[in-house]
């Protein structure tokens, strides 16, 4: 069974995308708001009936209904509101994630957990510490979205399909992410060979600003892109496809970094993170990567210390 904790835009849209992959007969949506997950589940069941899909949705306000889940997706959390500091957001979401982690540990102790809650690299660290699961079973959703945004923007300039580009984005999921066009390829040729310096700079800027651009345009954050990426990750895990994704994972010496979650390429299969792929970065690339890691560490300082143990 797949459980989605949080029935807002990202959670509900992810549930809809999972319908088309038909990875499990049952998807459970859990939320603290009474009626919300039940309503989403009912609507999704109607859609599944129309499309002839076998998946059945259940909505609940009781965490016990995640019992036996092999994958849990956590989309719950507060969005940053006007006047709210980053420290306040980190503190409130850390409290929420810690509470959810306790329920996952109780009812789905063998699950693989993927989280989208922001600030991502800090919240996945909180989740990992609270769960006490092996690091391969705790994953932050980040790079799938960031790297494919970069591929999209590059494809618009080059004039090829985005899936023909192998993009690389490293480090923090946020304004200090490090897009690496020099390490991104189009059938063996570096992406930078197809771009002028001005185009290169523009792609990097657009990739970093993409989330904010969506929010500024429509008044709320992205849900379609994250949901599509989450469904693809779950597909690779459930079907043991061992596809390469970028995700925020716990580094324990990889890339010269320890005790931090950061965005790097990984192989996802039936055990969660099957392998962390270490790229051969140039000294300049490594310096930029480490600058991004410092931003991740700074985010952690905004989390109340009781949630980091």
UniProtKB/Swiss-Prot annotation:
Q: Which domain of life is it from?
A: Archaea
Q: Which SUPFAM superfamilies match?
A: LDH C-terminal domain-like (SSF56327), NAD(P)-binding Rossmann-fold domains (SSF51735)
Which Gene Ontology molecular function entries are recorded, alphabetically? L-lactate dehydrogenase activity; L-malate dehydrogenase (NAD+) activity
For NAD(+), which residues are the binding ones? 6-11, 31, 93, 116-118
**UniProt record, GO biological process:** lactate metabolic process; tricarboxylic acid cycle
Keyword field contains GTP-binding: no
Its name, as the record gives it, is: Malate dehydrogenase
Species of the source: Caldivirga maquilingensis (strain ATCC 700844 / DSM 13496 / JCM 10307 / IC-167)
Q: Which gene encodes it?
A: mdh
């Amino acid at each position: 069974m797949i459980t989605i904790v949080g029935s807002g835009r990202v959670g509900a849209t992810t549930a809809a995308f999972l319908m088309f992959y038909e990875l499990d007969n049952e998807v459970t949506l859990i939320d603290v708001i009474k009626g919300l997950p039940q309503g989403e589940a009912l609507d999704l069941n109607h859609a599944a009936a129309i499309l002839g899909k076998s998946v059945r949705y259940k909505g609940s306000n009781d965490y016990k209904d995640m019992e036996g889940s092999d994958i849990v997706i956590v989309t719950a959390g507060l969005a940053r509101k006007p006047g709210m500091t980053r420290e306040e957001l980190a503190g409130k979401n850390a409290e929420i994630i810690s509470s959810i982690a306790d329920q996952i540990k109780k009812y789905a102790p063998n699950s693989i957990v993927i989280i989208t809650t922001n600030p991502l690299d800090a919240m996945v660290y909180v989740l990992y510490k609270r769960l006490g699961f092996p690091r391969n079973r705790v994953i932050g959703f980040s790079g799938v979205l960031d790297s494919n945004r970069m591929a999209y923007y590059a494809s618009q300039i080059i004039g090829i399909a985005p899936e023909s580009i192998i993009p690389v984005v490293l480090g923090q999921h946020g304004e200090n992410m490090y897009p690496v066009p020099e390490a991104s390829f189009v059938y063996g040729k570096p992406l930078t060979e197809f771009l002028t310096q001005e185009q290169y700079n523009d792609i990097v800027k657009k990739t970093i600003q993409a989330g904010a651009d969506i929010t500024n345009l429509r008044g709320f954050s992205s849900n379609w892109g994250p949901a599509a990426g989450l469904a693809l990750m779950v597909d690779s895990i459930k079907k043991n496809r061992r596809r390469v994704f970028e995700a925020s994972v716990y580094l324990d010496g990889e890339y010269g970094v320890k005790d931090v979650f950061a965005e790097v390429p990984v192989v996802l299969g039936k055990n969660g993170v099957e392998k962390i792929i270490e790229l051969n970065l140039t000294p300049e690339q490594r310096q930029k990567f480490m600058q991004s890691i410092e931003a991740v560490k700074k985010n952690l300082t905004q989390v109340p210390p009781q949630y980091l143990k």
